[in-house]
């Protein structure tokens, strides 16, 4: 069934359902950032030691995105979404019951398996179900779900963790996923696999230098961001010396700014994606370099978080738009690779932040993250001058 055979209202409702699913999946990926201290206290570990959980999760997603996508390339998409949500929910129940850090990590690996499949198919499904001529808006809506995960999901998850324990945060996410699953079952039509690609697509994609350059840019800039972002909660409390409540407010502010970035990209991204992304990377570089100097003032940290959140949302959207434009004939394979590469960056950044915190000083995470951010800025200028791409261009 296509959007031509259903009303625009129903088409948008389906896209909104996917956006809610995106909110759920991104909430569970981001929420440990706000719970590291509580989890560490529960298992009598150092915060930096618990942080390795972020790297494990991200690298499992990176490793399994493409294999899982290929294994499920011929599976009807509605059925696939239902199955991955079942795994997702069961894994969160195990997170709630975790009696050791090892069990918690195992449960997070289960979530990562579901995550690996979900993000390899979501963007293409959103475009497919959107009303005619509304591809960019559909992607922006999915991105809004991502932003709301930081705006509402992460801070609410942290608040629940503060008052009811971190286990209840994961349990609540599982309940939210169950409700979303019921909505998916009711709203989505049968969705045969389309343009999913196969192993035969890989050599073709690898021979596209513009696409490979975007992938390289993605891993470098995401590494820069997560070097600092992964440990922002303990940084605010232990280095800046501010309260746990302020740390929650800062995460809320950073996520809320992401919505501003989503709006900006939704209006200008089709025509000026390259310029927006390079500008956003430059803004990220400045934010990381100023993280420690800004730590002497709540106002300074708050202002920095606003620009940081705007920058990362524009970067994430810009990378996704370019990947879709450069691989219209194998969107699922290309997005599986993108999801995997993005998570390599998350894992690498979390690991770098972990090592800096353990063996140097957590106060240096911003400066260390600024190094790959500078490299990403230079690389973005080079590749965008050589391969300018907009959403409508399907360059190969």
Swiss-Prot record:
The chain crosses the membrane at residues 15-35, 50-70, 81-101, 103-123, 136-156, 170-190, 209-229, 246-266, 275-295, 299-319, 333-353, 364-384. It is found in: Cell inner membrane. GO terms for molecular function: carbohydrate transmembrane transporter activity. One of its GO terms (cellular component) is plasma membrane. Keywords: Cell inner membrane, Cell membrane, Membrane, Sugar transport, Transmembrane, Transmembrane helix, Transport. The keyword Cell membrane applies. Its main location: membrane. It comes from the Bacteria. The keyword Iron-sulfur does not apply. InterPro entries: MFS (IPR011701), MFS_dom (IPR020846), MFS_Efflux_Transporters (IPR050189), MFS_trans_sf (IPR036259), Sugar_effux_transptr_put (IPR023495). Gene3D superfamilies: MFS general substrate transporter like domains. Pfam families: MFS_1. It is a multi-pass membrane protein. Involved in the efflux of sugars. The physiological role may be the reduction of the intracellular concentration of toxic sugars or sugar metabolites. PANTHER family: PURINE EFFLUX PUMP PBUE, SUGAR EFFLUX TRANSPORTER. Belongs to the major facilitator superfamily. SotB (TC 2.A.1.2) family. HAMAP family: MFS_SotB. This is Probable sugar efflux transporter. The lineage of its organism: Bacteria, Pseudomonadati, Pseudomonadota, Gammaproteobacteria, Enterobacterales. The gene is sotB.
